[in-house]
C-alpha cells in the first residue's frame, strides 16, 4: 500500500511538471507568476531556516515564559507569525513543545489562534506596501547582505543571513507575481471567468483550498490573490472567497506536521482544523455582512473606495479576529471533544518496551528533544526494573518499599 502511494505521488508530480512546462511554453506571463510563487516559497523556507538558528534555547525560553496564560499564548502566536511570516513554523514549534510536555494543549491552542491572526499581517504587508512601491529594489540589498552573512561560521550571523535572504526572496517573489499579472492584462482578462453569488463563493473557496494544499502555504496563496486583485485580474468578491479557502487549506499543513508527532500534537492539529474550518464556514454564511463591516471600516480608516487590496486585508483580519473571539469561550468544550476523539492507547503488560515519548516532531528543537529523552530514559528505567523484578519473581513494590532483602 505504501509503495502504491509513493508511485501515485510520483505520477502526480510528473503530470504536474508536464502541465506546467506546457503552460510556460504557451505564456511567459504564467512563467513569471509561477517563478514569483516559487521565489516567495523559497523565501519562506529561508526565513524558517534563519529562525531555527535562534531556536537553540532562546525561542524555547521565550515560549515557556510568554504562554502561561491564554492572552499571552495568543499574543505569542500573533508576534511570532508576524516576524516569521510563517504560521506553519509556529504550528510546528507548538506541536513540538506540546509533544514534549513543555506546554499544555490549552496554551498550544492559544498559540494557533494567535498565529491565525498573525497571518493577516502578510496581507497588510503586500496590500499596503508590496503593490504600492517597487519592492524589488528593497530585495536586492537584502539578498546581498543575507548571502554575505550566510557564509559566516557564527551560527547567529548565519541565522541573520537566512532571515535577510528570506525577506529578500519574499519581496522579489511579490515583484515577479505583480509584474506577471500586470502583463497578463494586455493578453487576457481573467475577470471574464468571474462567478457571482454563493455559487461563485463556493467554487472560488475550493480553488483557494486547492491552491493552498498545492503550495503548502496560505501566505503564498494570499499574496497570489492580492497581486491578482491588484492587477484587476479577479473580482473583489471572488478574492474574498479565495482568501477564505486559503485559510481552510492551511490546515493540511498542520495535519501533515502532526503525523509524526505524539497524541498531544495530533490534538493540537485537530484544534487547528476545527478552528479554521468553523471560521471559514462562519465567514461564508455571513460574507455579505462582513463586506458591509469592511466598507464602513474602510471609510472610517480613509481607505479609498477602489482600493480592494487593502479591503481584502481588512476582511481577512476581521474574520480571523471574530473567529478567535467566538472560539475562546468554547475552548474547554473543544478540548473535551479532542480528548474524546484522540484517546490514549492503553499499555498492555507485554508492551513494556514500547516507546512512549520519542517522536520526530519533538526532536526538531533542542529543549524539546532533551525533555522527551529525559522522559523516555525514565520510562526505559521502569521497563528494565519491571523485567528484572519479574525475572527474580519479586514484586516491584516490595523492592521500592524499603523492606529488608531477606523479607523480600
Where are these regions (language model features)?
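Interfacial loop-to-helix junctions that mark the boundaries of transmembrane helices
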Residues: 2-7, 24-34, 127-137, 190-197, ...
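Hydrophobic core segments of alpha-helical transmembrane domains in multi-pass membrane transport
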Residues: 12-24, 36-46, 77, 81, ...
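Membrane-embedded alpha-helical segments and adjacent helix-loop junctions characteristic
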Residues: 31-94, 154-229
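Alpha-helical transmembrane segments and their lipid-water interface positions
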Residues: 39, 52, 88-92, 119-126, ...
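The feature identifies polytopic integral membrane transport proteins across all domains of life
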Residues: 58-61, 71-79, 102-112, 190-191, ...
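Membrane-interfacial helix-loop connectors
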Residues: 81-86, 90-118, 123-138, 143, ...
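Transmembrane alpha-helical segments and their short flanking loops
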Residues: 130, 174, 185-197, 259-363
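Non-transmembrane accessory domains of multi-pass membrane transporters/channels
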Residues: 321, 331-408
Amino acid at each position: 500500500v505504501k509503495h502504491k502511494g509513493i508511485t501515485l505521488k510520483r505520477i502526480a508530480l510528473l503530470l504536474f511538471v508536464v502541465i506546467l512546462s506546457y503552460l510556460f511554453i504557451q505564456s511567459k506571463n504564467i512563467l513569471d507568476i509561477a517563478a514569483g510563487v516559487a521565489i516567495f516559497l523559497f523565501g519562506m523556507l529561508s526565513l524558517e531556516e534563519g529562525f531555527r538558528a535562534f531556536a537553540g534555547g532562546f525561542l524555547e525560553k521565550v515560549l515557556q515564559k510568554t504562554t502561561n496564560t491564554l492572552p499571552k499564548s495568543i499574543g505569542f502566536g500573533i508576534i511570532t507569525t508576524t516576524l516569521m511570516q510563517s504560521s506553519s513554523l509556529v504550528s510546528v514549534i507548538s506541536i513540538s513543545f506540546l509533544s514534549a510536555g513543555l506546554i499544555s494543549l490549552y496554551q498550544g491552542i492559544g498559540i494557533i489562534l494567535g498565529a491565525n491572526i498573525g497571518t493577516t499581517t502578510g496581507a497588510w504587508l503586500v496590500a499596503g506596501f508590496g503593490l504600492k512601491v517597487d519592492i524589488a529594489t528593497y530585495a536586492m540589498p537584502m539578498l546581498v547582505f543575507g548571502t554575505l552573512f550566510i557564509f559566516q561560521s557564527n551560527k547567529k550571523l548565519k541565522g541573520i543571513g537566512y532571515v535577510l535572504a528570506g525577506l529578500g526572496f519574499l519581496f522579489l517573489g511579490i515583484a515577479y507575481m505583480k509584474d506577471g499579472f500586470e502583463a497578463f492584462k494586455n493578453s487576457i482578462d481573467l475577470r471574464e471567468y468571474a462567478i457571482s453569488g454563493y455559487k461563485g463563493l463556493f467554487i472560488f473557496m475550493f480553488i483557494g483550498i486547492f491552491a493552498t494544499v498545492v503550495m503548502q502555504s496560505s501566505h503564498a496563496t494570499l499574496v497570489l490573490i492580492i497581486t491578482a486583485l491588484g492587477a484587476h485580474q479577479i473580482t473583489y468578491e471572488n478574492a474574498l472567497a479565495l482568501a477564505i479557502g486559503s485559510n481552510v487549506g492551511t490546515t493540511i499543513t498542520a495535519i501533515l506536521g502532526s503525523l509524526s508527532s505524539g497524541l498531544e500534537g495530533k490534538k493540537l492539529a485537530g484544534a487547528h482544523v476545527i478552528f479554521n474550518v468553523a471560521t471559514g464556514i462562519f465567514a461564508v454564511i455571513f460574507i455579505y455582512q462582513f463586506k458591509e463591516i469592511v466598507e464602513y471600516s474602510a471609510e472610517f480608516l480613509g481607505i479609498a473606495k477602489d482600493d480592494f487590496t487593502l479591503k481584502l486585508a481588512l476582511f481577512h483580519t476581521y474574520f480571523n479576529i471574530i473567529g478567535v473571539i467566538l472560539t475562546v469561550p468554547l475552548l474547554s468544550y473543544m478540548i473535551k471533544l479532542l480528548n474524546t476523539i484522540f484517546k490514549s492507547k492503553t499499555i498492555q503488560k507485554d508492551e513494556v518496551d514500547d516507546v512512549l515519548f520519542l517522536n520526530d516532531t519533538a526532536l526538531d528543537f533542542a529543549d524539546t528533544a532533551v525533555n522527551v529523552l529525559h522522559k523516555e530514559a525514565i520510562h526505559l528505567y521502569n521497563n528494565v526494573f519491571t523485567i528484572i523484578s519479574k525475572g527474580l519473581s519479586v514484586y516491584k513494590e516490595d523492592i521500592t518499599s524499603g523492606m529488608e532483602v531477606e523479607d523480600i
